[in-house]
């Protein structure tokens, strides 16, 4: 097998991608491709936990029912059943790998989270994602069959034209574009929160896997369903940090810039209304009262809570806010809603197989059907582990004989990176603002149509960039050696902007198509949930259609 030939190429180094590497058969040669340094994915940021029905008083059936209730009629019952019944084994495997979950004595500690009927959420202090990713990374680095390519950017999938099979991926790495030929490609690139002006996702969450798959003809679905958290610490230059709903549960007030407690203007329960209601209240209040609502905040005032109780209940929030210059005992926390989790993704079955043979997807990149229209808390890390476990049984066809003599010729190209920088940076600044205002927490047909028209204009301009004309249609049988000022930074900016423009178009199209409100999708002009829309929104190429839901509720 040649240097650029692999059995499986895994794209993404969060919990999903790392665990996939560990679950793939040990005799497979695996390439792990990650566009940044390791441990910059969203699962490393996950403060929440991982859910499993392991308590004597709990059951997979109860976990199943809670998941379906949260999913607002769009969960796939078979996928949810698979998830909850494999959850205890997933926890056992993580413990065996060395993840140190919190314990009460000899027993794993379980906490109760929103919309769960039983305490079933395991934590590793308040940084569960980091604990899992750190442990898995150590295991992957020790695997002799896994070759890690850091700061490598996936550009396009290699689809065999006669069979339609995915046979590899084109990658920019070490200032060279080359094709990694493989028997399968697994996309585990996380979500796309950077398409919105406010997000809890890290900078690398630009929807890469979903964009790559869609451009290659894979089916994607339910992309209108995005979960927004109502209260994230929001300061210029500071990464968004979630302020738990428990803070409002203890009595904290939401105030606007004038000091008005405004939440009761939108719902009789005020700050204690459901998460999506509070998010909409803040979003609408900022739209009504601020000149630039995409950059504005409201304030979470903890003064009604006794200081001793704050210290006992929220030590991590105290520490993190203080680190970013906010003393919560002396001042309110500036907060705003933020895009948090993308329920939709590349359509897959329970074996991670997409609609393209040889192409697999996992984690937030995939749409397995377990989340429906609204994810149940702490099911996302679980989904990564449970579905990755299926890859132990992965059987692949031989590498195509045409791939045995590849990348022999090298072509050198100098890229003038300065020409296109202004437009690329303009889109990276303006696209998240446009999406936040038109496809964020509150949507309506008129503004969605306006945004789609703007996106179509930007897409046409993107295709006319000198860099796009040069890079978008490179031959797969050549290595391309690139040079130019600031090349690595430019290539990441170019590729991510391409992906963000595409996923923005997909979100807008799906949101306009669904003429109702359900789960993580709210239409001001269609505020009711309608039985006839209890179906998945599917996009395949330019075709948009409904697919009946397999929900068992």
UniProtKB/Swiss-Prot annotation:
FAD binds at residues 13-16, 35, 42-49, 208, 364, 380-381. Binds 1 FAD per subunit. The active site is at residue 275. It is an enzyme of class 1 (oxidoreductase). It catalyses: L-aspartate + O2 = iminosuccinate + H2O2. One of its GO terms (molecular function) is L-aspartate oxidase activity. Keywords: Cytoplasm, FAD, Flavoprotein, Nucleotide-binding, Oxidoreductase, Pyridine nucleotide biosynthesis. Pathway: Cofactor biosynthesis; NAD(+) biosynthesis; iminoaspartate from L-aspartate (oxidase route): step 1/1. The record marks 113 as: Important in orienting the L-aspartate substrate. Its cofactor is FAD. GO terms for biological process: 'de novo' NAD biosynthetic process from L-aspartate. GO terms for cellular component: cytoplasm. Pfam families: FAD_binding_2 (PF00890), Succ_DH_flav_C (PF02910). The keyword Ribosomal protein does not apply. Its main location: cytoplasm. It comes from the Bacteria. It is found in: Cytoplasm. Its EC number is 1.4.3.16. Belongs to the FAD-dependent oxidoreductase 2 family. NadB subfamily. Catalyzes the oxidation of L-aspartate to iminoaspartate, the first step in the de novo biosynthesis of NAD(+). This is L-aspartate oxidase. It comes from Synechocystis sp. (strain ATCC 27184 / PCC 6803 / Kazusa). The gene is nadB.
């Amino acid at each position: 097998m040649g240097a650029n030939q692999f059995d499986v190429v895994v794209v993404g180094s969060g919990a999903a991608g790392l665990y996939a590497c560990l679950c793939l058969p040990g005799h497979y040669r695996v390439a792990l491709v990650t566009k940044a340094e390791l441990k910059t994915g969203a699962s490393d940021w996950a403060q929440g936990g991982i859910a499993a029905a392991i308590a004597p008083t709990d059951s997979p059936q109860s976990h199943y029912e809670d998941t379906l209730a949260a999913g607002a009629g769009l969960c796939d019952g078979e996928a949810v059943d698979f998830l909850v019944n494999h959850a205890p084994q997933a926890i056992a495997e993580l413990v065996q790998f060395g993840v140190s979950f919190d314990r009460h004595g000899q027993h794993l500690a379980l906490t109760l989270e929103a919309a769960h009927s039983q305490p079933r959420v395991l934590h590793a202090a308040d940084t569960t994602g980091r604990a899992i990713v750190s442990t898995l990374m150590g295991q992957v680095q020790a695997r002799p069959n896994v070759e890690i390519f850091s700061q490598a950017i996936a550009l396009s999938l290699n689809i065999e034209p006669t069979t339609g099979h995915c046979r590899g991926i084109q990658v920019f790495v070490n200032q060279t574009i080359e094709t990694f030929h493989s028997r399968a490609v697994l996309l585990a690139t996380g979500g796309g929160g950077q398409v919105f002006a406010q997000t809890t996702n890290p900078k690398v969450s630009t929807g890469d896997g979903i964009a790559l798959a869609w451009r290659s003809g894979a089916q994607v679905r339910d992309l209108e369903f995005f979960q927004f958290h109502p209260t994230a610490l929001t300061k210029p230059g500071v990464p968004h940090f979630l302020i738990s709903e428990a803070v409002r549960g203890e009595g904290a007030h939401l105030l606007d810039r004038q000091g008005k407690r405004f939440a009761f203007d939108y719902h009789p329960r005020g700050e204690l209304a459901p998460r999506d209601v509070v998010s909409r209240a803040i979003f609408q209040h900022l739209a009504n009262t601020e000149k630039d609502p995409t950059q504005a905040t409201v304030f979470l005032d903890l003064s009604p809570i006794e200081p001793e109780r704050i210290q006992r209940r929220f030590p991590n929030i105290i520490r993190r806010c203080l680190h970013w210059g906010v003393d919560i005992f002396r001042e309110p926390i500036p907060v705003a809603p933020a895009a948090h989790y993308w329920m939709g993704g590349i359509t897959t079955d329970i074996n991670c197989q997409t609609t393209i043979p040889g192409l697999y997807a996992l984690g937030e990149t995939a749409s397995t059907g377990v989340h429906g229209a609204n994810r149940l808390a702490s099911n996302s890390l679980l989904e990564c582990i449970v579905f990755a476990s299926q890859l132990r049984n992965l059987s692949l066809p031989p590498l195509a004989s045409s791939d045995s003599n590849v990348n022999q010729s090298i072509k050198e190209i100098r890229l003038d990176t300065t020409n296109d920088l202004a437009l690329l940076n303009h889109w990276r600044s303006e696209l998240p603002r446009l999406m936040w205002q038109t496809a964020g927490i509150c949507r309506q047909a008129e503004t969605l149509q306006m945004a789609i028209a703007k996106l179509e204009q930007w897409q046409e301009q993107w295709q006319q960039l000198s860099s796009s004309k040069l890079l978008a249609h490179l031959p797969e049988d050549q290595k391309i050696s690139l040079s130019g000022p600031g090349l690595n930074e430019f290539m990441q900016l170019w590729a991510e902007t391409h992906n963000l423009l595409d996923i923005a178009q997909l979100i807008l199209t799906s949101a306009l198509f669904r003429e109702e409100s359900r789960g993580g999708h709210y239409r001001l002009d269609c505020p009711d949930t309608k039985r006839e829309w209890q179906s998945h929104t599917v996009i395949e190429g330019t075709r948009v259609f409904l697919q009946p839901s397999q929900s068992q509720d």
